């Protein structure tokens, strides 16, 4: 006699659940993504809560408190001007995260516009891509250094310089996806139905380019934080009186032996932030990129 399978032996498929929920579940199954998300949340919370968990005065100096080592009174010690490093590192997180996120979002938006325009309007493809190739011929950090030095040490200059350096990468990613999508049957059907270019782009092309663009955005976010720290270290990035991780490291390089903590803590903050965002980007790439997807 044939035995009937127990109802508990069947697993109900995820019917009716939105793609966003299913994607979030797949992401949360990945340990590296969870670690990156937790680390990034810690950095973001520290930056947001900085006015309440520090003395709120990142530029307050005290000759009497110069070169104080880490302790209960000053968790990260003080620098050569007697400024509290715990306060400066947390306020520096606000600047670095804001610049990194702004650069990533602007690069993604402008890169998407250029990439889709090049793929859809083929008469502009050669011109736009040659400009992107010319920008990509220079290492991103060297291009950013040149633009930032020409514009002067301002926050807006840093954002313009870094955005200019990373737009080509986003544009090429979007163009590659859009070139494939424009030849699909449903895009041809939309053309035959009389849909306008704008409608096809916004309804069929752009939404299907978002996955690779989002992955690229996360990596640009991490690269922008590192690049901003580099520019500030060289003195052409975030200007005083804004606290910046790169400028704090630069101020501590002359005291790396006797006051090692000046360089150590902002360096750790840069490393943790870049690592966290890269771990998140790796998880997004594995889940969202069809070429690397290994699980349904």
Swiss-Prot record:
Family: Belongs to the binding-protein-dependent transport system permease family.
Protein name (Swiss-Prot/TrEMBL): Putative peptide transport system permease protein BRA1093/BS1330_II1085
Gene3D superfamilies: MetI-like (1.10.3720.10)
Residue intervals of the ABC transmembrane type-1 domain: 97-281
GO biological process, one term: transmembrane transport
Record's bilayer topology term: Multi-pass membrane protein
Family annotation (CDD domains): TM_PBP2
Record's function text: Probably part of an ABC transporter complex that could be involved in peptide import. Probably responsible for the translocation of the substrate across the membrane.
UniProt subcellular location: Cell inner membrane
Keyword Magnesium on entry: no
Origin: domain of life: Bacteria
InterPro entries the record matches: BP-dependent_transpt_permease, MetI-like, MetI-like_sf, OppC_N
Keywords: Cell inner membrane, Cell membrane, Membrane, Transmembrane, Transmembrane helix, Transport
Subunit structure: The complex is composed of two ATP-binding proteins (BRA1094), two transmembrane proteins (BRA1092 and BRA1093) and a solute-binding protein (BRA1090).
Pfam families assigned: BPD_transp_1 (PF00528), OppC_N (PF12911)
Regions that span the bilayer: 35-55, 97-117, 131-151, 205-225, 229-249, 260-280
GO cellular component term, pick one: plasma membrane
């Amino acid at each position: 006699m044939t035995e009937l399978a127990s109802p508990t032996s069947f697993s109900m498929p995820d019917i009716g659940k939105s793609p966003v929920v299913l994607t979030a579940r797949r992401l949360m199954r990945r340990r590296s993504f969870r670690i990156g998300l937790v680390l990034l949340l810690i950095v973001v919370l520290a930056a947001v809560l900085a006015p309440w968990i520090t003395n709120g005065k990142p530029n307050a100096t005290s000759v009497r408190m110069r070169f104080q080592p880490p302790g209960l009174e000053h968790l990260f010690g003080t620098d050569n001007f007697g400024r509290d490093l715990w306060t400066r590192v947390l306020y520096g997180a606000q600047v670095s995260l804001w610049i990194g996120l702004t650069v990533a979002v602007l690069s993604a938006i402008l890169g998407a516009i250029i990439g889709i325009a090049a793929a859809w309007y083929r008469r502009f493809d050669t011109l736009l891509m040659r400009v992107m190739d010319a920008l990509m011929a220079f290492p991103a950090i060297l291009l950013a250094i040149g633009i930032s030095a020409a514009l002067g040490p301002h926050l807006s200059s840093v954002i313009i310089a870094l955005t200019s350096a990373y737009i080509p990468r986003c544009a090429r990613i979007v163009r590659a996806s859009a070139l494939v999508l424009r030849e699909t049957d449903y895009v041809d059907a939309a053309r035959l139905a009389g849909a306008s270019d704008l409608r096809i782009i916004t309804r069929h092309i752009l939404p299907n380019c978002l996955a690779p663009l989002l992955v690229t955005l996360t990596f640009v976010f991490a690269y922008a934080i590192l690049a901003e720290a580099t520019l500030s270290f060289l003195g052409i990035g975030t200007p005083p009186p804004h606290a910046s991780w790169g400028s704090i490291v630069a101020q501590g390089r002359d005291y790396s032996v006797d006051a090692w903590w000046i360089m150590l803590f902002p360096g750790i903050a840069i490393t943790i932030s870049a690592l966290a965002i890269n771990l998140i980007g790796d998880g997004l790439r594995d889940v969202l990129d069809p070429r690397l997807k290994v699980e349904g």
